[in-house]
UniProtKB/Swiss-Prot annotation:
Protein's name according to its UniProt entry: UPF0251 protein Spea_3639
Short name of any one Pfam family annotated for the protein: DUF134
Entry-linked PANTHER family: PTHR37478, UPF0251 PROTEIN TK0562
Disulfide bond residue pairs: none
Family: Belongs to the UPF0251 family.
Amino acid sequence: MSRPKKCRHLSCCVPYSLFKPNGIPSTQLEKIQLEADEFEALNLGDVQKMSQLDAAALMGISRQTFGYLLASARKKVATAVTQGQALLLPQIANKD
């Protein structure tokens, strides 16, 4: 049995729910789900260029967990882009 998911601090808002290849209906595509914490890790680590230690502290998780989330997110994005799959983005409620 796996451990229960820890509540994590998520700060960004996702502008879209689906990212897919142009010209192909989403019903014809395989879909990969990007989880909210993976999206946040990708945003903090790659877009905002935060160190893993700082980003992990902001999310309230360990640096190792942050590294796992970032690696998982990168793999999912790379798979979707290189294999022409749809990427389902998480719906994160805006806290404003």
